[in-house]
Design a protein with these regions (language model features):
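An N-cap/entry alpha-helix motif that binds or orients negatively charged groups
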Residues: 5-76
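Alpha-helix-loop-beta-strand connector modules within alpha/beta enzyme cores
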Residues: 54, 104-128, 154-155, 161-179, ...
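Active-site mouth loops of central-metabolism enzymes
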Residues: 60-78, 125-134, 175-179, 228-233
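Glycine-enriched alpha-helix->loop->beta-strand junction motifs that scaffold or abut catalytic
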Residues: 90-91, 116-119, 144-150, 170-174, ...
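Glycine-rich phosphate-binding active-site loops on the catalytic face of alpha/beta enzymes
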Residues: 96, 141-161, 198-207, 245-266
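Catalytic cores of alpha/beta
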Residues: 134-145, 181-192, 229, 233-252, ...
């Protein structure tokens, strides 16, 4: 026998399953049917512009029932109610997991959140489809469901597919969040022309978290790129650390899913939450 095949990573396993899911979805609803549904889909807002509006630091709050690393986080959670808690707390973006097997999310969750924030008008948070996207079909699905952006994970895409999905997303009016975890992926993301790059502190191969990842990689990006720090963020100190490293946004999932008052927690992360102990504001 030849050399042993490396064990598939968690990312490999999820992507392989997603490819099967997409093949099934195409049989149930061909791409032409989705294309036809585009006419009635809600108009996306500019994701980068919406994040920059909350300078110096935008919070993207994530709706996540479960994950491969933690198992169930909040399995019975109502995605729409949680999304509205995030919106009321001042989130610039709401990331909705739509992967069904490991994260227990659905496209219906995303459509529901998008419908609910519609009432806020132009100030509404942008809605991100958080998934393992490997096919234009999923980008179409996202747009029809009301997404303003989609996640593209560099580790799961070759350069050609990354470029193709970036272009296709932009044609549909969505600026993607392009996710990286190491220097090689960061260079690939920059070369692809990504405008919003998310540095994931969690390695999707092992699911280990290292908050130093953002510190190390942020300096590789050029000035025009909007950087977001993803994973492992739970305190105002974490946010300040990533802001100092050059990030303009943080994506926060698990700590908000577990918070008693997610809206207040977002205020705390943004530094806009006023508690009785912080009275220095009045001295300005």
């Amino acid at each position: 026998p030849g050399p042993a095949m490396p064990e598939p990573t968690i990312l490999d396993t999820i992507v392989a399953r997603r490819k099967l899911d997409v093949a099934e979805a195409k049989l149930a609803k061909p791409a032409q049917a989705l294309q036809a549904a585009l006419a009635g889909a809600p108009t996306p807002i500019d994701f980068a512009e919406r994040l920059r509006r909350d300078r110096p630091m935008a919070v993207i709050a994530e709706v996540k029932r479960a994950s491969p690393s933690k198992g169930d986080i909040a399995p019975g959670m109502d995605a729409v109610a949680q999304g509205m808690r995030y919106a009321s707390g001042g989130a610039a973006g709401i990331s909705v997991l739509t992967e069904p097997t490991w994260f227990k999310g659905t496209l219906a969750d995303l459509a529901g959140v998008r419908g609910a924030v519609e009432s806020m008008g132009k100030t509404r948070p942008a809605v991100l489809r958080k998934d393992f996207i490997i096919d234009e079909y999923q980008v179409l699905e996202a747009r029809v469901a009301g997404a303003d952006s989609v996640l593209l994970i560099v580790a799961s895409l070759d350069d050609e597919t990354l470029a193709q999905l970036l272009d296709f997303s932009r044609e549909l009016g969505m600026e993607p969040l392009v996710e990286v975890n190491n220097a090689e992926e960061m260079h690939r993301a920059i070369d692809s022309g990504a405008a919003i790059i998310g540095i994931n502190n969690r390695d999707l191969r092992s699911f280990d978290v290292d908050l130093g990842t953002t510190d190390r990689l942020a300096g590789l990006a050029s000035g025009g790129v909007l950087l977001a720090a993803l994973s492992g963020i739970s305190t105002r100190a974490d946010v300040e650390r990533f802001q100092a490293a050059g990030a303009g946004a943080v994506l926060v999932g698990e700590s908000l899913m577990l918070a008693d008052d997610p809206a207040a927690q977002i205020g705390e992360l943004r530094g806009t939450h006023v508690s009785l102990s912080t009275t220095h504001d009045s001295a300005v």
